[in-house]
Amino acid sequence: DRISDTHLIDLHKVLAFVKQKADVPVWIVGTSRGTVSATAAAIKLQGEMAGVVLTSSVVSFKKPEAVPRQDLAAIKVPVLVLHHTKDACHLCQPSEVPAILRGLKNAPIKKEIMFSGGANPSGNVCNGQHWHGFIGAEREAVDLIANWIKNPVN
């Protein structure tokens, strides 16, 4: 369970370990089901991270732990939401992504980017070799994230 206390304790330990190794701002980046974890961490481990990046977010309101169903108003760090316009995963429909931004009422900076690059998707639409994983444009997506983290703006 990605919003359980046990999972959050694990995330706390990872954050503490990274901070011990490097004196730099630490961001959490979650992809797909990892967005559930990253969102829960931003809500419950406040002060432990500089910001959050959510890619290919679980947005389906059918899932109790979906990103838009969590207490997004409790997040008080910058948030980037990156999603592929052609993501066909049933839990990650692009049309539901704006619900995340609407919920981030107290994030000082929040940005939604709908991405359209890439090529040659194959296999399961919810896996990394499809639009869900920014297939054919992974480097471009990572560069976009890294550049935004360096200079987060709305």
Language-model segments: residues:
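Second-shell loop/turn segments in exported
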Residues: 1-5, 86, 130-135
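Alpha/beta-hydrolase active-site loop
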Residues: 2-21
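Primarily recognizes the serine-hydrolase "nucleophile elbow" in alpha/beta-hydrolase
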Residues: 17-74
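Acidic catalytic loop of the alpha/beta-hydrolase fold
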Residues: 61, 85-92
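Short, conserved loop/helix-junction motifs that constitute active-site signature segments
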Residues: 70-76, 103-107
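Short beta-strand/loop motif that positions the catalytic acidic residue
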Residues: 75, 81-83
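C-terminal catalytic histidine-bearing segment of alpha/beta-hydrolase fold enzymes
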Residues: 109-154
